[in-house]
């Protein structure tokens, strides 16, 4: 664990057992289910697969970027960023946050519209063009898509690319 002025990095030996882009919705896997089950029983850890969902809820409440997960050949690193202002966020932070929040909403059966993302990013209604740009960038990255291509722009809803 390393702590910096604007981020916290946590590294772990071994790679993820699931695709990093499907970390919110994929059924969890354990390297050692017997130990994992025991740790849940003694309340050292919680139910499998709820960590990133709960992390996204916390990030949303603080209006900070979604975690960045990097996988190497023999390690996984998670970076949690702390930016005071959306203007300080990097473009990739905005795209990652839009995508992961869309995934979070999808698995929780919440429709994602511009207003939902404005709330996630802490953007006022009068600045909705900022969110429209983030949505466009995330769609261009191939991470989200329209849930219905035949609706008017004000009625657009978004879902993850894999939905």
Language-model segments: residues:
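C-terminal regulatory or interaction extensions
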Residues: 1-163
């Amino acid at each position: 664990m390393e702590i910096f002025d604007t981020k916290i990095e946590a590294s772990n030996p071994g790679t993820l057992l699931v695709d990093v882009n499907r970390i919110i919705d994929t059924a969890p896997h354990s390297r050692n289910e017997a130990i994992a089950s025991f740790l849940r029983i003694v309340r050292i850890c919680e139910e499998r697969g709820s960590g990133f969902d709960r992390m996204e809820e916390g990030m949303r409440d603080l209006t900070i970027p979604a975690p960045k997960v990097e996988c190497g050949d023999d390690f996984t690193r998670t970076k949690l960023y702390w930016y005071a202002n959306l203007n300080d966020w990097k473009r990739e932070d905005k795209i990652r946050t839009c995508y992961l929040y869309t995934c979070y909403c999808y698995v929780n059966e919440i429709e994602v519209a511009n207003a939902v993302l404005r709330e996630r990013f802490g953007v006022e209604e009068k600045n909705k063009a900022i969110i429209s740009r983030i949505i466009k960038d995330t769609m261009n990255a191939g991470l989200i898509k329209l849930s219905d291509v035949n609706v008017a722009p004000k009625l657009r809803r978004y879902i993850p690319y894999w939905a």
